[in-house]
Amino acid sequence: MKIGIIGGSGLEKSDILLNQEEIEIETPYGKHSPIKKGNLNENEIFILSRHGYNHEITPTKINNRANIYALKKLGCEFVLATTAVGSLRNQIEPGDFLIANQFIDFTKHRNITFYEDFKEGINHTSLAEPFSEKLRDYLIESCTELNFKHHKIGTILTIEGPRFSTRAESFMFRNFAHVVNMSTSPEAILAKEAELEYAVIAMSTDYDCWKKTEEPVTWKIVKEQMEQNSEKVKKLLLKTIEKITNQNTIKADLEFIKSKIRTIPNFPKQGIQFRDITTLLKDPEGMKKVIEILYNRYKDKNIDVIAGIESRGFIIAAILAEKLNASFVPIRKKGKLPAETISETYDLEYGTDTVEIHKDAILPNQNVLLIDDLIATGGTALASCKLIEKLQGKIHEVSFLINLPELKGIQKLSNYKVFTLVDFNNE
């Protein structure tokens, strides 16, 4: 996989990246900032030094179009950008990370789009959600696991530079944003136009100049704080790259799992496409991948009980329960459990059905994972959730191997967290 890193990360100065070399790409927009390529496990990492190795390129003079074009042409799918920011909020202290979810463009003199005309078609790119939610999730998870103080949402306001704000500007900016910098726009705009998964690690270095009890920001303050934070930034990037890599492996595994599920047309009646998991169950590699994905998702969630829905849900739930050292509990159709039960009736297209659980299956406040092989209309799953709640169990998540999105079953479970492995859309 190819991953781009923009800004000062420290990785390019370490021996973590193997086979480092300088890269230069010809672009329609002129010369890009210096790029260094290196290998990290199976990944190719491209580190773009936005301001140059000696910080010789001013914010306004950064050739953002050439930079993003070069990373796209090099084949990067993901881009992690680091940036120093001035905090506009008391709670965002120097040394904190902000994983921004929005930005405001306050620049005036920069080329902000690849689409200077519409000769090849109209393009109005949506920037409603300017940053990759997938990458933001990885960054937030990584900060949490590394125990780094961070803020999960916030708005960056980008100014022109290279000067810092006046005090009046700083007070005004506080009405709009959480932090201020000189780098994020138009970099984020261009990354969105280039269809890159792009996210920003904003490192608070100062309080700009609005806070009278603090010294107004200077380059010296910014540089010193960046140097103090450099090791943390490096660890955060490496942890996030590991998550990106793992997710890419999972994506390939899910495609393999899906390929092992057989579709039988017109079963059990005309017009039904039956998703048959018996072909997956008999495939050791496919089942191993299913259990590994679920195990890695729930291994740190303190699951007490795994409830499986009759009947194919039993298979996955029982195997996973053993691996997680959790109890396995069956949820069955009416009349199939031998001891005292409680029941829940739900509507079918024509008539009703009932599911039951043993009255002593779950203790109050136990953390319960509910599993079935497939979610279609969601009636059975919702009834099963209600059974668990009648016993005062806490539903951690409802997990399915297969989702049939056109039947909208997940919508019935809107009060619960739902996880699915593969979707079948009229295939």
Where are these regions (language model features)?
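Short glycine-rich phosphate-binding loop at a beta-alpha junction
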Residues: 303-310
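Metabolite-binding pocket within alpha/beta catalytic cores that recognizes anionic/polar moieties
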Residues: 1-127
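Active-site-facing substrate-recognition patch
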Residues: 252-303
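PRPP-dependent phosphoribosyltransferase catalytic core
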Residues: 253, 257, 382-427
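Active-site rim beta-loop-alpha module in soluble metabolic enzymes
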Residues: 130-175
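His/Asp/Glu-rich mid-to-C-terminal helical/loop segments that flank catalytic regions of hydrolases
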Residues: 209-249
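Short, glycine/charge-rich flexible loops or terminal/linker lids adjacent to PRPP-binding catalytic cores
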Residues: 326-368
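Zn-dependent metallopeptidase/amidohydrolase metal-coordination segment
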Residues: 185-220
